[in-house]
């Protein structure tokens, strides 16, 4: 918060966390240089070394992003001025506005634990479906 000129509700823990913040509001940065390039972005949360600092190219500053979460060393936004991205994992990069990304390109599997657990997806008409797998390995989509 060393360059803060305005803004409110910001929390920074770690050397250079929110270091360029000038007028942004309601950001939380934990870790060395996390969200350090944010100048006008708002309502972002970043945890980890350099989390939320850059965009996916690794050099362009994430300075105006908003409503996003970055967890992991060098977790990055897809682009500057992005919105509503959830990015989890070391070196993971977002995949666009209103998206969630878990892991970088080296992650080869995503496991959902628990008996009966599933993934809920929404169709274009708004109907929600729970996707599960039965004991024979068949994929089942159930409207919920």
Feature roles, as predicted:
Residues 115-144:
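Extracellular "spike/adhesin" assembly and maturation modules
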């Amino acid at each position: 918060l060393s360059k803060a000129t305005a803004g409110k509700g910001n929390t920074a823990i770690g050397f250079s966390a929110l270091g360029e913040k000038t007028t942004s509001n309601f950001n939380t940065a934990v870790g060395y240089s996390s969200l350090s390039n944010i100048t006008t972005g708002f309502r972002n949360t970043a945890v980890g070394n350099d989390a939320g600092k850059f965009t996916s190219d690794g050099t362009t500053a994430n300075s105006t992003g908003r409503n996003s979460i970055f967890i992991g060393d060098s977790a990055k936004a897809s682009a500057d001025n992005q919105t509503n991205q959830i990015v989890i994992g070391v070196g993971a990069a977002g995949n666009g506005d209103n998206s969630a990304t878990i892991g970088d390109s080296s992650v080869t599997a995503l496991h959902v634990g628990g008996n009966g657990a599933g993934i809920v997806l929404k169709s274009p008409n708004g109907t929600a479906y729970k996707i599960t797998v039965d004991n024979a390995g068949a994929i089942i989509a159930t409207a919920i």
